[in-house]
Amino acid sequence: MEKYLPACLDSVTDELVSDRLEVIVVNDGSTDGSLDIIRRYEQKRPDLIKVIDKANGHYGSCVNAGLGIATGKYFKILDADDWFDTSALVEFLQKLETCDTDLVITLRVDEIFDKDKKVDEIKHSFCSVFKDHVYRTDEFYIRTHSYEAEFGMNGMAYKTSLLKEMNFRLLEGINYTDTLYCFLPYSRVKDFIVYDLYLYHYRMGREGQSVDTESQKKNLMQIVHMV
């Protein structure tokens, strides 16, 4: 992850956004140079970055560790090989100042790489009927039968208080826990809003990635367990 990490951290430490963020970086027992990179960013911005250095426990343990010390109004996850669009993040943070829904949904761009060369991008939209309007969750169930609607873990920002009040924790020591993150807290959500912002840039094509076909074959029973 070390070669992707600077782009990830740069996207959340830009001067345009850093005064309105709490950045929690979890080092999950990395054996490359990731921790050294994290410490350099921490030294530059000790007011912004909180570092958790722990033994490897897989994805769920990282989310649990970060949520455990989170104090911000909303909780959003960014993987080490992905990044936020700075201009979209600026607008997103401005909107969150007045937003009060339990869940905020933004859009995603899949960045397709062949080795380290970008070869394509796919923008995942959300039907315009949903955008910039507060909906109750029961309205969402009804409307998604008639309109295209797509979102996942990387498009979701839950209220931190909602996650903490339900004592939310992901399973640890197992992959593909994003399914639980999407649906378990959502069962407590009363309302949500969709912002037309392509905030999350999701890197695809990295060898060993969890969505890689070979990785999914290898971890098939973990996927079945999550479902």
Where are these regions (language model features)?
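Short aromatic/hydrophobic "clamp" motif used to bind/position activated sugar donors
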Residues: 75
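Acidic helix N-cap motif at the loop->helix transition within catalytic regions
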Residues: 3-6, 32-41, 53, 87
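Structural signature of beta-strand start/N-cap positions in the alpha/beta core
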Residues: 22, 48-50, 102, 191
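Short, acidic, metal-binding catalytic loop of nucleotide-sugar glycosyltransferases
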Residues: 10-20
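A conserved acidic beta->alpha catalytic loop
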Residues: 11, 27-36, 55-58
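Short beta-strand/loop segment that forms part of the nucleotide-sugar
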Residues: 20-29, 50-55, 80
